[in-house]
């Protein structure tokens, strides 16, 4: 079936580019081209009444159309960026994702994020966090322009032609989470207060901007490590234009949590739900006293611990021949299907094996052209675990499975 083959080729291209740590805009343009082809095929198939192509389910017409339009938008945008002086910058696929492009300030490319902390009512437990971008790329009729975003006591803004265009207003959350109408903004080694304690607290003619010294004369605040929003649920859904302080909305709150080594991630929680994110395995709903507004920082969460075997090395280490020999499985077949299987195994069956490799191929006598099928190698603690894995995990029939044992001479 020609459509199924074209779909498989487009998905194979996407998987290859997703696994490739590229900073080249040309690779990202190819990725969105493959994404565009995939959703165009889905749209045509759904129009004909098909619900699947091969083993791949076909999304609804609306979903396929929206995904195709997003891919076309990003493909054209990156082609335009490729012709600009900024094409020489290192652009990761995450930097040019459609989700980040639409995140506030919307319809801009953004890099180098940092976290701004806001404390309401002078209560260290009543705080929330916002994302600020050191580099904001705006496409205008005159070409691409590089600007920055910043924070003050009013909110977070983008500098556009010497004026501040706010895309986040702290007063909105102060009405929801505070009682006194006061808050403190901490941006790296700068602090701003609202309302100002005196006329001297006004900076640049804007009320409430109290900037503390950058040197040793005043308190400093070390900025948290950058955290990048990867999906619309982690971004504040608002546009690039200025905001009306009287406008209210129900937005998601973003919580940074500290991992080992001091690294931080963003975990999003709704105002009325438990924390949800890639690290939350068990969350407890919080209760609020009737006389106090909900605190943005009042939700607790636990770090999820991926179940792994006791035979595992420390994180990041891999020893194929620990103990002298290792029972394994080789799974071979269509590269895209093998990659999809590996993703499913890591997501749903992580406790059933020891380690799993990336997808690899044999190469020809010259160059790096791939030959044969895509292959993954799965290792186990012993043959019993391997037998349990093969007996409980469903593997597509078109993929071949070989039991092998690797040992030293």
Curated annotation (Swiss-Prot):
One of its GO terms (molecular function) is nucleotide binding. One of its GO terms (cellular component) is host cell nucleus. One of its GO terms (biological process) is DNA replication. Residues 300-315 have a biased composition (Basic and acidic residues). Phosphorylated. Residues 192-251, 269-315 are annotated as: Disordered. It is found in: Host nucleus. Signal peptide: none annotated. Its main location: host cell. Residues 1-199 are annotated as: Transactivation domain. Residues 325-409 are annotated as: DNA-binding domain. Belongs to the papillomaviridae E2 protein family. This is Regulatory protein E2. The lineage of its organism: Viruses, Monodnaviria, Shotokuvirae, Cossaviricota, Papovaviricetes. The gene is E2.
